[in-house]
């Protein structure tokens, strides 16, 4: 169950992200700005900022855009003061959904998030209602047909917590948030390039949705992703579409 459709779901996620590249830039600029505001403008001493910058450059964001976002976060340039908020709720068949936002207007954001849940058969819950169902961790996903033994050796020596062999043949490396960058860098030095590499909230248990239920859940997730203030959406649902 843990590995069901993992590879297909990741490919779908990547395709959806590529289709929304303009929005990704906006989200990354927000993340860089907030990371710099909270932890300073030096990526060497601010892991959150380094991750955001790595992701931005991975999406070919111009260096000038990144530097301006850092300066806004550090107060060197004027900019919007974003607030981080998390909303929790339920989708189809009780699948848990967690929505991380950055906003300059909390009232607008909660209204938009609640509307998306209500319109697509879900409901917005209270703080803490589903967050306990997820673990904060680093996640790196590798395509099937790679050297599993070598990857396992490099990952564990670099400080990875686990390597999961999914049913579809893909390999998943799990790290703590703090060791994610070190593990990723060591794997890249050994020529292992992840198809997906991120610090995320991984569900403890997944719920498989198929047919109409999967289609309905996809509409809810898409509606949440389309909200301007939404940064990330996490769910316990695995969609078999």
From Swiss-Prot:
InterPro entries: Integrase-like_N, TACO1_YebC-like_2nd/3rd_dom, TACO1_YebC_N, Transcrip_reg_TACO1-like, Transcrip_reg_TACO1-like_dom3, YebC-like. SUPFAM superfamilies: YebC-like. It holds the Pfam family Transcrip_reg. GO terms for molecular function: DNA binding. It is found in: Cytoplasm. Belongs to the TACO1 family. HAMAP family: Transcrip_reg_TACO1. This is Probable transcriptional regulatory protein Neut_0281. It comes from Nitrosomonas eutropha (strain DSM 101675 / C91 / Nm57).
């Amino acid at each position: 169950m843990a590995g069901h459709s993992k590879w297909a779901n990741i490919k779908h996620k990547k395709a959806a992200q590529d289709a929304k590249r303009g929005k990704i830039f906006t989200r990354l600029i927000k993340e860089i700005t907030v990371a710099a505001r909270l932890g300073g403008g030096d990526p060497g001493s601010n892991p959150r900022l380094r991750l955001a910058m790595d992701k931005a450059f991975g999406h070919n964001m111009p260096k000038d855009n990144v530097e301006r976002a850092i300066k806004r976060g550090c107060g060197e340039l004027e900019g919007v003061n974003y607030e981080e908020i998390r909303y929790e709720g339920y989708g189809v068949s009780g699948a848990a959904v967690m929505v991380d936002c950055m906003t300059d207007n909390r009232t607008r954001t909660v209204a938009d998030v609640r509307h998306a849940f209500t319109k697509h058969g879900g409901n917005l819950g209270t703080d803490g209602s589903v967050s306990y169902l997820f673990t904060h961790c680093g996640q790196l996903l590798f395509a099937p047909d790679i050297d599993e033994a070598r990857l396992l050796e490099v990952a564990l020596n670099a400080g990875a917590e686990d390597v999961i062999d999914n049913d579809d043949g893909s390999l998943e490396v799990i790290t703590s948030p703090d060791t994610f960058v070190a593990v990723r860098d060591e794997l890249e030095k050994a020529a292992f390039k992840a198809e997906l590499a991120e610090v995320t909230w991984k569900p403890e248990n997944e719920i498989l949705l198929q047919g109409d239920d999967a289609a309905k859940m996809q509409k809810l997730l898409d509606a949440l992703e389309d909200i301007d203030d939404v940064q990330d959406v996490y769910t316990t649902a695995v969609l078999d579409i």
